Amino acid sequence: MTRAAAGIVYAVVFILCLVLGIVPTAIFVSVMSGLCCYEFFRMTRLDGKMANERMGIAAAVVFPLSALGDSMLLNALLFALMLAVGIWYVWSPRTRISDVAVTLMGPIYTGFMLSAIVLLRDAVPGFAGALLSVGVCASLWVSDSFAYIVGSRIGKHKMVPKISPKKSWEGFAGGILGSVLIWLILWATHFYKLSLPYALLCGVVVSILGVIGDLIESRIKRGVGVKDSGNLIPGHGGMLDRSDSLIFGCITAQLLLMIGGVL
């Protein structure tokens, strides 16, 4: 399967789940989170960290499911994870504090953060909710695509060459433009209490946080000496490689929409 075909299949399945409703969305994000967490632990293993992988992956899988209907369950699970990891640390003399930190970071970085997609889908009923959640994710995908196209054509000024050599400031600007275009479409539907200036702000900020998410994952990969987090998706690497911008971008969108009174 080619890179383009793999990317299309991933996007179609993702969008279909968002359109079908909150339960398919939660199940898809749950599976995605579990795979991302597994890949995260796989990379940290290369750095000598011995996380409690079963506990971490289980939490990553359950986080999005706990976001169904009541965000308080999400907070309760976060407390339960902290408690369980603390008990594991107390009763495991050989466990290092770095192992504890990685065990906590894995599911929080993946499952907890990605649960924002479920909360977004659940916040607005019907077609408008499906469109909003698809639009938020699409703004990050389009941002990535625009950044790649612009950066590969005219990118000359590198952002952080030691972490992500291909990223340029020109591509960064192109990515923001792509994200803003999607947010303008959301504004133009008039389905939401979204003013034009606030739609522009959301487009810019969400794109920037998506790039930060991408750079964080690139830093992890660079630190452990791997090119991709995995090989699950042909031409794209692992699930974490496909989700890195969503991890920070979607929760940023959710917070901005809550602050702006849209949700």
Where would I find each of the regions flagged by the language model?
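Membrane-embedded alpha-helical bundles of polytopic integral membrane proteins
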Residues: 1-204
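Membrane-embedded alpha-helical segments of transport systems
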Residues: 143, 173, 240-248
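Juxtamembrane boundary at the C-terminal end of a transmembrane helix
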Residues: 255-263
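Hydrophobic side chains within alpha-helical segments
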Residues: 6, 42, 147, 217-220, ...
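Hydrophobic transmembrane alpha-helices of multi-pass small-molecule transporters
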Residues: 179-180, 242, 249, 258
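Interfacial loop-to-transmembrane junctions
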Residues: 223-246
